[in-house]
Regions:
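Short acidic-glycine-tyrosine-enriched beta hairpin
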Residues: 61-80
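Glycine- and acidic-residue-biased ligand/ion/polar-headgroup-sensing regions
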Residues: 42-60
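Short, surface-exposed secondary-structure edge patches
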Residues: 26, 46, 67-68
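Conserved short histidine dyad/triad with adjacent acidic residue
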Residues: 25-41
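Double-stranded beta-helix
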Residues: 4-7, 88-123
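Short hydrophobic/aromatic-rich beta-strand segments that constitute the beta-sheet cores
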Residues: 26, 56-58, 97
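Short beta-strand His + acidic residue motifs that chelate non-heme Fe in jelly-roll/DSBH
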Residues: 36-37, 56-57, 79, 85-91
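A short, N-terminal "cap"/entry segment at the start of jelly-roll beta-barrel domains
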Residues: 1-23, 36, 69, 113-123
Length: 123
């Protein structure tokens, strides 16, 4: 049950399943925390908010995020490959979400307890 797995997750990111062409991860963003401005050159991404509120930003250039939209439970976000994007928790409770990458974006079994852990691995 992805809804339950998302809401029960307390890690910044955990890869629950990794196939040859897609990957499912769950994430938890603390109040004021963001995913971090990023771009996946060859990976499409689908995100669904299960709990919490925030803002999604997207654009073709990281200095021009010309799309901004408020998000909440039930919001689905589609990020085309090559698009700069960020998701920010603007609420007072943790934001819980799941994301599907195609193709996979993280090694099988990835667990990042915190955003800092994710950034260490990425750099």
């Amino acid at each position: 049950n992805i809804h339950h797995a998302s809401r029960e997750n307390n890690t910044f990111r955990t890869a629950l399943w990794t196939g040859r062409h897609v990957q499912l991860t769950v994430m938890s963003l603390q109040p004021g925390e963001d995913i971090g401005l990023e771009r996946h050159p060859h990976t499409d991404q689908f995100l669904r908010i299960e709990q919490g509120v925030g803002v999604v930003q997207m654009g073709e250039d990281k200095s021009n995020l010309n799309f901004q939209h408020y998000v909440g439970p039930g919001t689905a976000i589609l990020v085309p490959a090559g698009t700069w994007h960020n998701l920010i928790n603007t609420g007072s409770t943790p934001m819980k979400l799941y994301t599907i990458y195609g193709p996979p974006n993280h090694p099988h079994g990835t667990v990042h307890q915190t955003k800092a852990d994710a950034e260490k691995e990425h750099n």
